[in-house]
């Protein structure tokens, strides 16, 4: 038995989960927030307890030190060296990383080079790797990429209709994201349906504040909604998803909001989506509450959100030539029952239908009616478990 920790490092946060492997038992999990700011918050959950402390954490190295010391303080481990492996979520692996990889040689430098593809994520992911490398230099460190699952896409799906030189010289293509989540729920869907994954055609919908939809055939991604960056695809909490690219030069010419690349990125990534249209919130719970109060902008935002998701599901039904199941996962997908009902009711012509009694808050499993030809499943994602499994597989 070994202890492996899965890490998801953000620019000012560090989410973690400690496993006993190969039993896949969660020993503890936690979140450190507001790294680099005053009044940082460290939360540790274990044995039904939740312990929280507020302190000033300057950087990721200090955050990791506090995490490890908390594990000892709460008697979850006796010493640092009980942890024999650490796995790090990394958003962008580009074309270079086609699978999870042990951190050695120039791997970390390559991760940082790929920050061009995920400027909001990869630098923070790399900071988490460096912090653990400094404090636990002898354990196996593994990087697990959101993009790896999508490297099976055919060229017709991942290429953009731009001049070829922008692909060959600049690597402009679709990379996708959330691959670890899509991979996990596809495997769980096969178990739930009692059929081999290799025999299934699935549409997996990872719908949280960020969202993506993937067409999965025989356990492999054949197309996905996110593109060159996690900005593409469906409408999201604060991101536009797909828009006409000509909008950008138009707004550069006629407004003061698009003067620099940073301005463009800020508006499209942080000020749009549900938040931008509703002028209210990026949180689906707030949107639904505002809809119930008759707020027009919130209602429009919700309708647009559902519409874009329905269109992508329909698109992937065409890509797959039908599907065995549509899978909902992540924060909104797992918990917003009215959202699931509304998405499926608009595409019921394809043979999918939701049973209202099964489609209740917090339910997992098959929520379809008996007569539905395409099953509708709700499966909680577990990206941390996939990361821990990959660490065990790659340990020296």
From Swiss-Prot:
Catalyzed reactions per annotation: acetate + ATP = acetyl phosphate + ADP
Oligomer status and interactors: Homodimer.
One Pfam family from the record: Acetate_kinase
Catalytic center residues: 146 (proton donor/acceptor)
Record carries keyword Translocase: no
Annotated site residues (Transition state stabilizer) in this chain: 178, 239
Cofactor comment: Mg(2+). Can also accept Mn(2+).
One function term, GO molecular function aspect: magnesium ion binding
Organism in which the protein naturally occurs: Streptococcus pneumoniae serotype 4 (strain ATCC BAA-334 / TIGR4)
Keywords: ATP-binding, Cytoplasm, Kinase, Magnesium, Metal-binding, Nucleotide-binding, Transferase
Entry keyword annotation includes Kinase: yes
Residue sites binding ATP per the record: 15, 206-210, 283-285, 331-335
Listed name of the protein: Acetate kinase
InterPro entries to which the protein is assigned, alphabetical: Ac/propionate_kinase, Aliphatic_acid_kin_short-chain, Aliphatic_acid_kinase_CS, ATPase_NBD
């Amino acid at each position: 038995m070994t202890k492996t920790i899965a890490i998801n490092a953000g620019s000012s946060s560090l989410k973690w989960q400690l496993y006993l492997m190969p039993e896949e038992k969660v020993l503890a999990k936690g979140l450190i927030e507001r790294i680099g700011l005053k009044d940082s918050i460290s939360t540790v959950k274990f044995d039904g307890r939740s312990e929280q402390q507020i302190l000033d954490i300057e950087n990721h190295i200090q955050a990791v030190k506090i995490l490890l010391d908390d594990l000892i303080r709460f008697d979850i481990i006796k010493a640092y060296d009980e942890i024999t492996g650490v796995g790090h979520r990394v958003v962008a692996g580009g074309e270079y990383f086609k699978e999870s990889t042990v951190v050695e040689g120039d791997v970390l430098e390559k991760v940082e080079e790929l920050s061009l593809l995920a400027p909001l994520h990869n630098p923070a992911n790399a900071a988490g790797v460096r912090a653990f490398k400094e404090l636990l230099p002898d354990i196996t460190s593994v990087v697990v990429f959101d993009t790896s699952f999508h490297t099976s896409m055919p060229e017709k799906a991942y290429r953009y209709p731009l001049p070829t030189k922008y692909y060959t010289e600049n690597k402009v293509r679709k990379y996708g994201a959330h691959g670890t989540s899509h991979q996990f729920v596809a495997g769980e869907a096969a178990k739930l349906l009692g059929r081999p994954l290799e025999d299934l055609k699935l549409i997996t919908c990872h719908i949280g504040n960020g969202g993506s939809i993937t067409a999965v055939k025989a356990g492999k991604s054949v197309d996905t909604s996110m593109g060159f960056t996690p900005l593409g695809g469906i409408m999201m909490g604060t991101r536009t998803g797909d828009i006409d690219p000509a909008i950008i030069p138009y707004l550069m010419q006629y407004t003061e909001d698009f003067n620099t690349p940073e301005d463009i990125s800020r508006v499209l990534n942080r000020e749009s989506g549900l938040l931008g249209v509703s002028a209210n919130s990026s949180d689906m719970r707030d949107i639904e509450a505002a809809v119930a109060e008759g707020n027009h902008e919130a209602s429009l935002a919700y309708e647009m959100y559902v519409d874009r998701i329905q269109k992508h599901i329909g698109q992937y039904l065409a890509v797959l030539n039908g599907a065995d199941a549509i899978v909902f996962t992540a924060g909104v997908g797992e918990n917003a029952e009215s959202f699931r009902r509304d998405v499926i009711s608009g595409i019921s012509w394809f043979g999918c239908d939701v049973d209202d009694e099964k489609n209740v808050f917090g339910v997992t499993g098959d929520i379809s009616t008996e007569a539905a030809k395409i099953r509708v499943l709700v499966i909680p994602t577990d990206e941390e478990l996939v990361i821990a499994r990959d660490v065990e597989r790659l340990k020296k």
